[in-house]
Amino acid sequence: MAKPEVNEMIEHSEPYFERVATGKVIELLDSQFIYEVHKVVEKGREKIPVDKTSTRMCMFDEIWSKI
């Protein structure tokens, strides 16, 4: 199971919600990582957070990739 590194840019896909989020990894945990959200595309609509304080979690075995 691949793991990102802190400060790497990633893309996190959630097909069930028709959502893809991109952001920078800020913390690694035992089975998941936390990333700062830079952009979210949900159901074809792009959303960019006004501030960079929005964070999300992703399990290592979810659909994600380095960008």
Predicted regions and their residues:
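Generic short amphipathic/hydrophobic targeting helices enriched at N-termini
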Residues: 2, 21-22, 33
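Intrinsically disordered, low-complexity, charged/polar segments
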Residues: 39-67
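Short beta-strand-centered aromatic/proline hotspots
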Residues: 19-28
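Residues that cap or initiate secondary-structure elements
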Residues: 16-18, 41
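Short, solvent-exposed secondary-structure boundary/capping segments
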Residues: 31-38
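Short coil-to-beta transition motif at edge beta-strands of beta-rich domains
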Residues: 1-16
